[in-house]
């Protein structure tokens, strides 16, 4: 959702997941997203692609200034929670291939959040803030090849599938099953 759109143009009550790319939402859109999350919705925040950090926060989290990996090197995801959460292993114990994520650029998070995945230098790659029945997740890189290989889907696709599934639980558990769960 672009920051230039007025919140009155969106009805989030029928949505399971929102993907937000860019600076933190302002005023009425910020309140609308907070309510959406508190009612069980999920929002994935992606940083903007500018070099500077963001002053505005959402649920106490903002992005710092862009960092660039040294020449011929990458930031690599090294650890993530394989037991629970959005990046957990499948029911057959097959891990999400999050360690295939490579980034040239990233924007570190500032604020208080739970780390779901870390880069090889120990900084957060994916953070989570819970609010009410839902959550906001914050990625520190973009699915653009000038930033990372996130668009390859090794981490992003299972993350989005599981977030959409979890967000849909707020509507009716009778019509929604988690990926890899048996009916």
Question: Which residues does each PLM region occupy?
Answer:
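A conserved amphipathic helix/loop scaffold
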Residues: 1-183
């Amino acid at each position: 959702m672009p920051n230039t759109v007025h919140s009155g143009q969106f009805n989030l009550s029928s949505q399971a997941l929102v993907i937000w790319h860019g600076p933190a939402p302002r005023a009425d859109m910020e309140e609308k997203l907070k309510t959406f999350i508190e009612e069980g919705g999920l929002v994935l925040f992606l940083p903007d692609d500018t070099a500077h950090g963001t002053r505005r926060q959402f649920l106490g989290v903002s992005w710092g200034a862009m960092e660039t990996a040294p020449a011929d090197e990458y930031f690599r995801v090294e650890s993530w929670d394989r037991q629970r959460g959005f990046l957990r292993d499948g029911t057959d114990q097959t891990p999400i291939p999050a360690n295939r994520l490579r980034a040239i650029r990233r924007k570190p998070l500032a604020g208080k959040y739970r780390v779901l995945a870390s880069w090889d230098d120990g900084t957060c790659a994916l953070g989570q803030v819970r609010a009410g029945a839902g959550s906001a997740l914050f990625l520190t890189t973009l699915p653009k090849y000038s930033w990372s290989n996130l668009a390859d889907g090794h981490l992003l696709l299972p993350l989005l599938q599981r977030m959409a599934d979890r967000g849909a639980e707020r509507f009716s558990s009778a019509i929604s099953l988690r990926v890899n769960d048996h009916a």
